[in-house]
Swiss-Prot record:
Pfam families: DeoC (PF01791). Belongs to the aldolase LacD family. Its EC number is 4.1.2.40. Keywords: Lactose metabolism, Lyase. InterPro entries: Aldolase_TIM, DeoC/FbaB/LacD_aldolase, LacD_aldolase, Tag_1.6-dipho_adolase. The gene is lacD. GO terms for molecular function: 6-deoxy-6-sulfofructose-1-phosphate aldolase activity; tagatose-6-phosphate kinase activity; tagatose-bisphosphate aldolase activity. This is Tagatose 1,6-diphosphate aldolase. Gene3D superfamilies: Aldolase class I.
Length: 325
């Protein structure tokens, strides 16, 4: 991949010495509030959310190559990252308009690539919901939006990480078998679209191409794919782009995510790392709400550390350097 000298430096900061991106994602806002609301009756406060992000950053960034945070609640956490950890900042508003199936993208109102860079970030991350089968009108609007962000990142000479979440406008349950059957095409075709150089994207943050809960050998009940078919989808995904790409954990349990990475490697996927969020830190939320800072730190230093340490060991065996793409 052809990077400017400045982008190259940022990419080095975001990855480990082997060129693998082992990044910790904690840019959750709406999802985090919902998670906290399970354990407390009152609305989570801004200071609560900020403090939890600080705790996770302090305890886990010594073991991550970089951390993804949001500028709304994550700025205090950006000040306590480990010296060796890079920083990504999210540029999108959380969630989407549920009154429409379009899920149009929307930047944070008072942020820009310039401002994100001024906060010390090594990359701009933007999340896009994309249904490859949506109308040309809707997808053209989304594509133009991404072009603007890409141009901003070129102007600021900062890497652009695009996170693509595939969906189907007509299927409301993305976790069911109906969507599982069409997910591979949705994920792979979206990657092809945004691999076009016109978008100026440096790294794709993507879903694995199948729902592992419906893969033979992983499924508890009915299956949507046998192992050979699932493996073929991972290979097809790998061939869909020349860009570096990393997997998101999509909130699945740590063990399943780790097993998925091994499966991807065995299938022949040359992915370049992960941006792993809830699979690493989710359990700290309950401890934080019920036992405060001390409880959260204890969890992060034991189970949280174990999650990230096991993930790192698996990444060294399964991921390849982004420099090879």
């Amino acid at each position: 991949m052809g990077l400017t000298e400045q982008k190259q430096k940022h990419m080095e900061q975001l990855s480990d010495k082997n060129g693998i991106i082992s990044a910790l994602a904690f840019d959750q806002r709406g999802a985090l509030k919902r998670l906290m609301a399970k354990y407390q009756s009152e609305e989570p406060t801004v200071s609560q959310i900020e403090a939890l992000k600080v705790l996770v950053a302090e305890e886990l960034t010594p073991y991550a190559s970089s951390m993804l945070l949001d500028p709304e609640y994550g700025l205090p956490a950006t000040k306590v990252l480990d010296d060796n950890a890079g920083l990504l900042l999210a540029y999108e508003k959380t969630g989407y308009d549920t009154s429409s199936t379009k899920r149009l993208p929307d930047c944070l109102d008072i942020w820009s690539a310039k401002r994100i860079k001024e906060e010390g970030a090594d990359a701009v991350k933007f999340l896009l919901y994309y249904d490859v089968d949506s109308s040309d009108e809707v997808n053209e609007e989304k594509e133009a939006y991404i072009e603007r962000i890409g141009s901003e990142c070129v102007a600021e000479d900062i890497p652009f990480f695009l996170e693509i979440l595939s969906y189907d406008e007509k299927i409301t349950d993305s976790s069911g078998i109906e969507y599982a059957k069409i997910k591979p095409r949705k994920v792979i075709e979206a990657m092809k679209v945004f691999s076009n150089p016109r978008f100026n994207i440096d790294v794709l943050k993507v879903e694995v191409p199948v729902n592992m809960d419906y893969v033979e050998g992983f499924a508890q009940g009915e299956t949507a794919y046998n192992k050979a078919t699932a493996a073929a989808y991972f290979r097809e995904q790998d061939q869909a782009t020349l860009l570096p790409y990393i997997f998101l954990s999509a909130g699945v349990p740590a063990q399943l995510f780790q097993e998925t990475l091994v499966f991807a490697k065995e299938a022949g996927a040359k992915f370049n790392g992960v941006l792993c969020g809830r699979a690493t830190w989710a359990g700290s939320v309950k401890e934080y709400v019920e036992k405060g800072e001390a409880g959260a730190r204890q969890w992060l230093r034991t189970i949280g550390f174990q999650n990230i340490d096991e993930l790192n060991k698996i990444l060294q065996k399964t991921a390849t350097s982004w420099k090879e793409r």
